[in-house]
From Swiss-Prot:
Biological classification of the source: Bacteria, Pseudomonadati, Pseudomonadota, Gammaproteobacteria, Enterobacterales
Source organism superkingdom: Bacteria
Organism field: Salmonella typhi
EC numbers on record: 6.3.5.5
Protein name (record): Carbamoyl phosphate synthase small chain
Family, per entry: Belongs to the CarA family.
Length: 382
């Protein structure tokens, strides 16, 4: 039986469609993502916590879902908005269609709405709070009340909500078409010990580190610098994550202590913003953020353009950079800051999401640079 669904934005705009997920309601900040593929990775990316994701590509669900493509152990997106759900999921890796997957994870979703209109509205007015209600006779008044009551992401610390509860080891490399997901590697085959802070880490980013010889100790977001330094890491990785970096004072203080050492530090997304804050810069909330797999970014050092995956609603304010932070990357969409490098320490960061799968691989050299810094640190420490 087909059930109705309704999306209402905080400005009162309504979109009527049909429910393709769980019955109930979902409230969050409505954003749009321009990726053509990777919807399962998007749904399970912890960076989308408290967000309702609109996918601009018209056909979503063509290839179904499978366990190997999950970026974390659960769906983190608050809700899903799409134009059309295909009747058939066709792929040799498919184990469950998208609608069944959403229902199993209790995710409210709506289809058959004008996603182009919604995206243009969000671009013009900025990201808005919204509410999806799915079921018999959705109540528009109730949806509007819930949308207006949502506090928004500004000032909200979600990293400590999505982080791991316990420290764990990670030694699995990346998926390949020939062999699929590999078995975990022996730690004897991984010469570099990297401590990875989980602010909402994606599995594929961890896999890219393992591909380059790193054995990972993944720690909760609120782990102290003293605990990490006792682990004698060769490098420290600051992961991606959701929401506003400014309230994460525990992470900022830990990073400040790492910057008093010569241990290499590499930050991605939220980790990039936290490194900037720990170095004395400031961050700002963006109008509608960057969400997609086709964002051009200029590498200022190499004078080349990279196509990158992006997922962030906050950015580092370039005007606030102290003298010891050098700009390395800038967005060619809006000129916002995309990368920094400390001039006095082996620490650098990138705003986008270097991807193992399914996104672009242009930013992979950033991982290679991290390994170069680790090798130099190890040789200098001897």
């Amino acid at each position: 039986m087909i059930k109705s669904a309704l999306l209402v934005l905080e400005d009162g705009t309504q979109f009527h469609g049909r429910a393709i997920g769980a019955t109930g309601s979902a409230v969050g900040e409505v954003v749009f993502n321009t990726s053509m593929t990777g919807y399962q990775e998007i749904l399970t990316d912890p960076s989308y916590s408290r967000q309702i994701v609109t996918l601009t590509y018209p056909h979503i669900g063509n290839v179904g879902t499978n366990e190997a493509d999950e970026e974390s152990s659960q769906v983190h997106a608050q809700g899903l908005v799409i134009r059309d759900l295909p009747l058939i999921a066709s792929n040799f890796r498919n184990t469950e269609d998208l609608s069944s997957y959403l229902k199993r994870h209790n995710i409210v979703a709506i289809a058959d709405i004008d996603t182009r209109k919604l995206t243009r509205l969000l671009r013009e007015k900025g990201a808005q709070n919204g509410c999806i209600i799915a079921g018999d006779s959705p109540d528009a008044k109730l949806a509007l009340e819930k949308a207006k009551a949502f506090p928004g992401l500004n000032g909200m610390d979600l990293a400590k909500e999505v982080t791991t509860a316990e420290t764990y080891r990670w030694t699995q490399g990346s998926w390949t078409l020939k062999d699929g997901l590999p078995e975990a590697k022996s730690e004897d085959d991984l010469p570099f010990h990297v401590v990875a802070y989980d602010f909402g880490a994606k599995r594929n980013i961890l896999r890219m580190l393992v591909d380059r010889g790193c054995r990972l100790t993944v720690v909760p977001a609120q782990t102290s610098a003293e605990e990490v330094l006792k682990m004698n890491p060769d490098g420290i990785f600051l992961s991606n994550g959701p929401s506003d970096p400014a309230p994460c004072d525990y992470a900022i203080e830990a990073i400040k202590k790492f910057l008093q050492t010569d241990i290499p530090v590499f930050g991605i997304c939220l980790g990039h913003q936290l490194l900037a804050l720990a170095s004395g810069a400031k961050t700002v909330k963006m109008k509608f953020g960057h969400h997609g797999g086709n964002h051009p970014v200029k590498d200022m050092d190499r004078n080349v353009v990279m196509i990158t995956a992006q997922n962030h609603g906050f950015a580092v304010d370039e005007d606030s950079l102290p003298a010891n932070l050098r700009v390395t990357h800038k967005s060619l969409f809006d000129g916002t800051l995309q990368g920094i490098h400390r001039t006095d320490k082996p620490a650098f960061s990138f705003q986008g999401h270097p991807e193992a799968s399914p996104g672009p691989h242009d930013a992979a050299p950033l991982f290679d640079h991290f390994i170069e810094l680790i090798k130099h640190y190890r040789s200098s420490a001897k």
